Amino acid sequence: MDLSLLWVLLPLVTMAWGQYGDYGYPYQQYHDYSDDGWVNLNRQGFSYQCPQGQVIVAVRSIFSKKEGSDRQWNYACMPTPQSLGEPTECWWEEINRAGMEWYQTCSNNGLVAGFQSRYFESVLDREWQFYCCRYSKRCPYSCWLTTEYPGHYGEEMDMISYNYDYYIRGATTTFSAVERDRQWKFIMCRMTEYDCEFANV
């Protein structure tokens, strides 16, 4: 093959390959703050936000009993479609306390675009906050809960939203006082392509 042709084709192949992640998604790969690819070390707090105009589409986590029964976390983001437009406002939701089960959706019809968490040694658990963004006056519909992630306490967690039409709006979690771990069910919703009158759904 002519060397000049190779130099012309190489950037095209690299660009086509690079736009898809491990799961065939054109989303930003899992964020890498450390050598091991996690946004936090065990027993440490963290704050993660998607870039402007992107939302969370994947959540990955591993559990360590010996490191305070804590988890390390990683996230992936994806740009929202043009039909949603740009986010009109973003905010941090109320804190979900450590050691308790909880259920929360983004208020004001928001979508999850980040997570913030702090670890408490006394409870061997974390408190959580969602970072939410609202897109004009779009409303959620056809919402459903995912299965539990992880499938059993202490297991690795790998949740990926394979459907472009559904967005994470929140989660419900259970907490095991014995295992000191959580199982998550994510609240997935579609969003209208037009403005609606409901202040919060």
UniProtKB/Swiss-Prot annotation:
Q: In which tissues is it expressed?
A: Expressed in fibroblasts, heart, skeletal muscle, brain and pancreas. Expressed at an intermediate level in lung and kidney, and at a low level in liver and placenta. Expressed at a lower level in fibroblasts from hypertrophic scar lesional skin and in fibroblasts from patients with systemic sclerosis than in normal skin fibroblasts.
Sulfotyrosine: modified positions: 23, 162, 164, 166-167, 194
Q: How is it modified after translation?
A: Sulfated on tyrosine residue(s).
Which stretches of sequence are listed as region 2 X 53-55 AA tandem repeats? 26-186
Q: Where are the sequence repeats?
A: 26-79, 70-75, 80-135, 125-130, 181-186
Q: Which residues carry this modification: Pyrrolidone carboxylic acid?
A: 19
The main location class comes to secreted
Q: List the GO terms this entry assigns under cellular component, sorted alphabetically.
A: collagen-containing extracellular matrix; extracellular space
**Description of what induces expression:** Induced by TGFB1, repressed by IL4/interleukin-4.
Annotated region (3 X 6 AA repeats of D-R-[EQ]-W-[NQK]-[FY]), positions in chain = 70-186
Q: Which GO terms describe its biological process?
A: cell adhesion; collagen fibril organization; negative regulation of cell population proliferation
Subcellular location(s) per record: Secreted, Extracellular space, Extracellular matrix
Domain of life of the native organism = Eukaryota
Q: Where is the signal peptide?
A: 1-18
Q: Which UniProt keywords apply?
A: Cell adhesion, Disulfide bond, Extracellular matrix, Pyrrolidone carboxylic acid, Repeat, Secreted, Signal, Sulfation
GO MF, one term, reads: extracellular matrix structural constituent
Q: How does the record describe its quaternary structure? A: Interacts with TGFB1, DCN and collagen.
State the function annotated in the UniProt record.
Seems to mediate adhesion by cell surface integrin binding. May serve as a communication link between the dermal fibroblast cell surface and its extracellular matrix environment. Enhances TGFB1 activity. Inhibits cell proliferation. Accelerates collagen fibril formation, and stabilizes collagen fibrils against low-temperature dissociation.
The UniProt family comment states: Belongs to the dermatopontin family.
Name of this chain's protein: Dermatopontin
Q: Which organism is it from?
A: Homo sapiens
Instruction: Tell me what gene encodes this.
Output: DPT
